[in-house]
A protein has these predicted regions:
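An acidic/histidine-cluster motif and surrounding catalytic segment
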Residues: 1-101, 109-117
Length: 117
């Protein structure tokens, strides 16, 4: 089950059902199943606080993923900075929604076991 939350901002995801199906398809393509996925939309300042508190990283980022997976069941928290998504979309010349989807899948791929390198 994918659930969406807002931390210090208000953001409403368009087409939640379509997004959920897409995430399920990505997980299935890697022989994984969605368990409990919490996607938390927040600001740059909030994600910086999370980065400092839990990872001891003093920099902004677009996503932080906390992995609680059990074997082939994906469970985790994905903190996503809406501010960074807006900046990334502008920088890369893409639509906000496309960049948001890219970052959500990026987080899901971390839960599957991929890293940034």
């Amino acid at each position: 089950m994918v659930r969406y939350f807002n931390e210090d901002i208000k953001y409403v995801l368009k087409q939640k059902l379509l997004n959920n199906r897409w995430l399920k398809t990505v997980a299935g393509s890697e022989m994984k199943k969605l368990g409990n996925i919490n996607i938390i939309f927040c600001s740059d300042n909030y994600i910086l606080e999370v980065n400092l508190k839990y990872l001891q990283h003093d920099y902004f980022t677009d996503i932080i993923t906390f992995d609680y997976c059990e074997k082939d069941i994906l469970n985790g928290d994905l903190f996503i900075s809406i501010d960074s998504i807006k900046d990334n979309a502008e920088h890369y010349g893409t639509e906000f929604e496309n960049e948001l989807c890219r970052v959500m899948v990026h987080g899901l791929l971390h839960l599957i076991g991929y890293d940034d390198h």
